């Protein structure tokens, strides 16, 4: 089922997500729904808070990059439950980021070139993988959602931040009707 997205202005996007104590049928259904929602909105990753669930879970549908820099997409998303990031590379690279919860806007963000993630999959098995380039950027972006952080919080250019203020307010107003009453920004 395609779920309704949470947009800038929703408090759930600013909360620390809850750890998932066990994988249930509801968890599996949430992953399926997140995958369908991500595909419907042409995303490459999606975190549970973006579909209104304050749970430590995200999905990603990029396996890697070719030597030419083209993305290699997967048939079903990789699932990261209760992820923990470690070993960020010291070298930072700038990359353009967008977010399904902040439609129509993109900005340059500095992030480590590589990262290690340890998480649990849908079978309850812990795994660790090391990612580089764009897949690493997706992991860091989605993991930020689990800590109430949006990519706009990482923007460094004052001119970009100033430029975004009016656009963010328009997004907040436009999608405010979709925000649950308890999650309305003041």
From Swiss-Prot:
<dbReference type="GO" id="GO:0006412">
    <property type="term" value="P:translation"/>
</dbReference>
<keyword id="KW-0648">Protein biosynthesis</keyword>
<dbReference type="InterPro" id="IPR023635">
    <property type="entry name" value="Peptide_deformylase"/>
</dbReference>
<keyword id="KW-0378">Hydrolase</keyword>
<protein>
    <recommendedName>
        <fullName>Peptide deformylase</fullName>
        <ecNumber>3.5.1.88</ecNumber>
    </recommendedName>
</protein>
<keyword id="KW-0479">Metal-binding</keyword>
<dbReference type="InterPro" id="IPR036821">
    <property type="entry name" value="Peptide_deformylase_sf"/>
</dbReference>
<feature type="binding site">
    <location>
        <position position="99"/>
    </location>
    <ligand>
        <name>Fe cation</name>
    </ligand>
</feature>
<dbReference type="GO" id="GO:0043686">
    <property type="term" value="P:co-translational protein modification"/>
</dbReference>
<keyword id="KW-0408">Iron</keyword>
<dbReference type="GO" id="GO:0046872">
    <property type="term" value="F:metal ion binding"/>
</dbReference>
<feature type="active site">
    <location>
        <position position="142"/>
    </location>
</feature>
<feature type="binding site">
    <location>
        <position position="141"/>
    </location>
    <ligand>
        <name>Fe cation</name>
    </ligand>
</feature>
<comment type="function">
    <text>Removes the formyl group from the N-terminal Met of newly synthesized proteins. Requires at least a dipeptide for an efficient rate of reaction. N-terminal L-methionine is a prerequisite for activity but the enzyme has broad specificity at other positions.</text>
</comment>
<dbReference type="GO" id="GO:0042586">
    <property type="term" value="F:peptide deformylase activity"/>
</dbReference>
<comment type="similarity">
    <text>Belongs to the polypeptide deformylase family.</text>
</comment>
<feature type="binding site">
    <location>
        <position position="145"/>
    </location>
    <ligand>
        <name>Fe cation</name>
    </ligand>
</feature>
<dbReference type="Pfam" id="PF01327">
    <property type="entry name" value="Pep_deformylase"/>
</dbReference>
């Amino acid at each position: 089922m395609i779920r309704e997205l949470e947009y800038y202005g929703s408090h759930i996007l600013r909360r620390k997500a809850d750890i998932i104590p066990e994988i249930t049928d509801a968890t599996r259904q949430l992953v399926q729904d997140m995958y369908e929602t991500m595909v419907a909105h042409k995303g490459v990753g999606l975190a549970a808070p973006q579909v209104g669930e304050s749970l430590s879970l995200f999905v990603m549908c990029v396996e890697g990059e070719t030597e030419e820099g083209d993305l290699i997409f997967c048939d079903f998303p990789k699932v990261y439950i209760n992820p923990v990031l470690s070993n960020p590379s010291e070298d930072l690279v700038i990359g353009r980021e967008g977010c399904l919860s902040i439609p129509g806007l993109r900005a340059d963000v500095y992030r480590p070139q590589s990262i290690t993630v340890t998480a649990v999959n849908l079978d309850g098995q812990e795994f660790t993988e090391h990612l580089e380039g764009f897949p690493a950027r997706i992991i860091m972006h989605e993991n930020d959602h689990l800590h109430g952080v949006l990519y706009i919080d990482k923007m460094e250019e004052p001119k970009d931040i100033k430029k975004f203020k009016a656009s963010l307010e328009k997004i907040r107003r436009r999608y405010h009707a979709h925000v649950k009453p308890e999650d309305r920004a003041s």
